[in-house]
């Protein structure tokens, strides 16, 4: 297991902040393999199903690109050693080692230190549901290498929650958190990496695929802010998981954002969505609000290159209730389709003169000047094609009329 000093642990706790502190932050999501390289070769990646060469040193060298948009937190890919070609980080094989494609343990520590020096918090992606696609050859996994560490091999029936929690997601061996060793190891591991690397928060993959009571213990073990992924658009299904973790991604609002700003559906859908969410979430202001991510085709792909709609959607995500999350490449109008096409390399397109890059920076400046996180969001006016709201002295007026390419 990881060894760490008391001083390191205290430093991590001091940086991490609580939920209220994270509400002040705006997060830039990067795929470590796709954001920036350190070798100077900046040609676009042509094989998006394999490693492209992004690493921690490249990220260190380009933190100013992130800071230039006003972001003060980053979400990075899972850090553990992966089965090839697990460029995304979700195919763990050795939980005690790091992914050598991204760099060494010292490189990772240097990234966190460099980010903190620029007042950028670091959220690390973690997985406690599954391991790499190794069939039933559990000897390939360390240290969870026994068959009894896993549930039986079965395919998920998404209409049966017991199946969701006990069967394999996309054929990936499903960890059995009811096993005392597995449960204890996963909690010790997340506590260890947070304290060794001074992470400020964790993003947790595949929340509904694990019994909810485990997440209460896991989050407590981590000791920092948790943002859970429940890939579902129903507030009644997603909401109860906030009883076990500090926060969740607002997937229900994600679908509404696409509908109203991408497809010009009625803005009353925003009001309706908030009304639904108020019945099922215990803290809407802690939910992660996003337009794009690595699991969904990008907004511009889903909505026929609607750049005007994207700008409206990004404005909403940065200023409405919740913690803003912006996926790398959105600021460069990326339009990738489903995975892996939505996981483009960025290093060839780090254009700080991009219209959306500049717009995001200006919105962040106003967001911080008004400290909008301290003010309740108040709906001021709504019509089918118009939505206005205020947060203190900060007024936002959005339209989806004329949203075209």
Task: List where the protein language model places each region.
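Fungal secretory targeting signals
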Residues: 1-16
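Active-site-adjacent bridging/hinge elements
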Residues: 8, 162, 290-291
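Active-site-proximal helices and loops of the catalytic beta/alpha 8
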Residues: 12-13, 112, 116, 188-290, ...
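Structural recognition of the beta-strand scaffold that forms the well-ordered cores
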Residues: 26-31, 72-78, 94, 121-128, ...
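Generic structural signal for secondary-structure transition and capping sites
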Residues: 35, 120, 296, 322, ...
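Second-shell loop/turn segments in exported
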Residues: 176, 301-303
């Amino acid at each position: 297991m990881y060894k760490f000093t008391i001083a390191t642990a205290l430093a991590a706790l001091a940086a991490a902040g609580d939920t209220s502190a994270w509400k002040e932050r705006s997060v830039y999501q990067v795929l470590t393999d796709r954001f920036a390289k350190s070798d100077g070769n900046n040609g676009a990646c042509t094989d998006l199903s394999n490693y492209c060469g992004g690493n921690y040193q490249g990220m260190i060298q380009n933190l100013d690109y992130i800071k230039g948009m006003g972001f003060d937190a980053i979400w990075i890919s899972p850090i553990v050693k992966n089965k090839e070609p697990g460029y995304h980080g979700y195919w763990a094989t050795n939980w005690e080692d790091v992914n050598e494609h991204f760099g060494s343990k010292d490189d990772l520590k240097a990234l966190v230190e460099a980010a903190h020096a620029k007042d950028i918090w670091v959220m690390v992606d973690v997985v406690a549901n599954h391991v790499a696609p190794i069939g039933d050859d559990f000897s390939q996994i360390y240290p969870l290498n026994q068959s009894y560490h896993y549930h039986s091999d079965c395919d998920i029936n998404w209409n049966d929650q017991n199946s969701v929690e006990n069967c394999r997601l996309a054929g990936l061996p499903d960890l059995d958190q009811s096993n005392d060793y597995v449960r204890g190891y996963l909690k010790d591991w997340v506590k260890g990496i947070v304290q060794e690397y001074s992470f400020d928060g964790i993003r947790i993959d595949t929340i509904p695929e694990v019994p909810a009571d485990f997440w209460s213990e896991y989050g407590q073990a981590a000791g920092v802010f948790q943002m859970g992924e429940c890939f579902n658009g129903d507030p009644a299904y997603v909401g109860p998981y906030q009883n076990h973790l500090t926060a969740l991604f607002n997937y229900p609002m994600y679908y509404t954002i696409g509908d109203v700003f991408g497809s010009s559906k009625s803005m009353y859908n925003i009001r309706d969505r908030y009304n639904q969410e108020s019945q099922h979430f215990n803290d809407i202001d802690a939910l992660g609000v996003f337009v794009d991510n690595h699991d969904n085709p990008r907004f511009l792909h889903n909505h026929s290159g609607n750049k005007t709609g994207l700008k409206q959607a990004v404005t909403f995500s940065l200023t409405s209730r919740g913690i803003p999350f912006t996926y790398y490449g959105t600021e460069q109008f990326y339009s990738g389709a489903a995975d892996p096409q939505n996981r483009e390399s960025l290093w060839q397109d780090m254009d700080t003169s991009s219209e959306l890059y500049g717009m995001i920076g200006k919105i962040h400046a106003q967001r911080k000047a008004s400290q909008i996180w301290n003010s309740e969001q108040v709906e001021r006016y709504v019509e089918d094609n118009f939505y206005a709201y205020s947060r203190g002295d900060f007024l936002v007026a959005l339209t989806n009329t004329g949203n075209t390419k």
